[in-house]
UniProtKB/Swiss-Prot annotation:
Radial intercalation is a developmentally reiterated form of migration by which cells move in a direction orthogonal to the plane of the tissue from an inner layer to an outer layer. Disulfide bonds: none annotated. Pfam families: CH_2. This is Sperm flagellar protein 1. Homodimer. Interacts with actin, TJP1, CGN and CDH1. One of its GO terms (cellular component) is apical plasma membrane. Keywords: Actin-binding, Cell membrane, Cell projection, Cilium, Cilium biogenesis/degradation, Cytoplasm, Cytoskeleton, Flagellum, Membrane, Microtubule. InterPro entries: CH_2, CH_dom, CH_dom_sf, Spermatogenesis_Ciliary_MAP.
Amino acid sequence: MASSVDEEALHQLYLWVDNIPLSRPKRNLSRDFSDGVLVAEVIKFYFPKMVEMHNYVPANSLQQKLSNWGHLNRKVLKRLNFSVPDDVMRKIAQCAPGVVELVLIPLRQRLEERQRRRKQGAGSLQELAPQDGSGYMDVGVSQKARGEGVPDPQGGGQLSWDRPPAPRPPAYNRALQGDPSFVLQIAEKEQELLASQETVQVLQMKVRRLEHLLQLKNVRIEDLSRRLQQAERKQR
């Protein structure tokens, strides 16, 4: 979530977020990041002077969430040459599943790229120690490494297994680079796919119900036919 980010990319994203100290327990990515506060904390973790946390108010209301995201877009993301379109911000604020991931993945790449440029010649980044407690990897996310090359969350290079990385379609690469139009298209296509899957499931249930009713009718017809034959024999 290519029309969605694949499992390995999500796996790496959750590992990355789990290694960043955040002010809230980590339960559900779409809800946790919906008001923009944790996104500001992630950026502040990399660049403390870039973010003033008092500008971001934890919120449940859509209006305040959009206000937080708007301020983050204008004052912080702009300095990273990064932007989240208004319609994508609204989807994130509404906790639409699978949308915030499409922002966090390219944002992570932008943060690590900028940090590498600032630390050129200073050696590799210091390894982040995993936090105690639960994280996104502990709340039902079970992924399998596919043997593909994935971005190294510490050095920005490639982690490789036995097999070389599979080639990515151009649309997938453009989405991971933060192309706003592709971010929105991917989010919309994912929602359409989920809706289609739900429709198929409902139709399958209806088919099974009709098959069951047909079986009951056949049994009833056989029973009535048998009784009719018995009555005819008695009359003779």
